[in-house]
Structures are given as structure tokens and as C-alpha cells.
Amino acid sequence: MLAGKGLHLQRENGRRETLSGDGTIAVFGGEEAISAQLQDGLITDLNLMTRRGAWTHDLQALRLQGEQLVENDAEVLLLWNAAQTAVRVDAGGVLHDIAAGNGLLVENEPGPLHLQSQRPALLYLGRLNARCR
């Protein structure tokens, strides 16, 4: 969940989860029956979905303030800035400024990413890799 007061999920096995804008991630298959109830008002969420036979994926929440180095080992990397401040990304010497509520898609560019934020930031990193073709 990127913005809003929260969301309650009821999984088909009876387990309940509450998502808020704190970086908590819910992982489930698309065929699982899940119901949701808003806590208070509308939300903005981020869903990362792939065809399991063709791709693998991982989603990570990363808290950032100052500088941090992240190794990109994915064929496709999505960086989503869920913070209220801009984040600077140096990908192989190419600088990208990701404004609040925006993302960056990096394709077939493995190697280190230098991340920088002057204020506390929350980034979501989605890593996608193709299964054997």
C-alpha cells in the first residue's frame, strides 16, 4: 500500500493481514480468493504481477536516507518512490531523479545502483527475471 489509512485483507485460509503505508508487503497467488476492506477512505496500492510460467519476481521495501548501494541482478528492475521526497539514482553513470509517487524501470542493466535521498524515503524494488526460454 502506497498511500491511505490502511487495508484489511482476509485470506481464504482465514488469516487476516493489515496493510498500511509502512512498507508491509502481502504476497499471494492471483488464484487465491481474498477479500479486502478499507480502514478509512481510499488507498493507493502497488501490485506486482507476473506470469509464473515465464517470470519470477520479488518485491522489497527499502528505507533510505542518505546514500545506499544496491546491486541490480534483475533483468527488469522497477524502483517505485513511495516517499514525499525525490530520490536520485545513479545507474552506471546515468543519473535519474525519481519524484515522489513516480518510478523508474531499468531493463538489462545489471550492476550497482547508487541511491541517494536527503530526507527519509521509502522505495519499493521489484526484481523480475525470465525463466528459461
Where are the model-predicted features located?
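Jelly-roll (double-stranded beta-helix
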Residues: 1-133
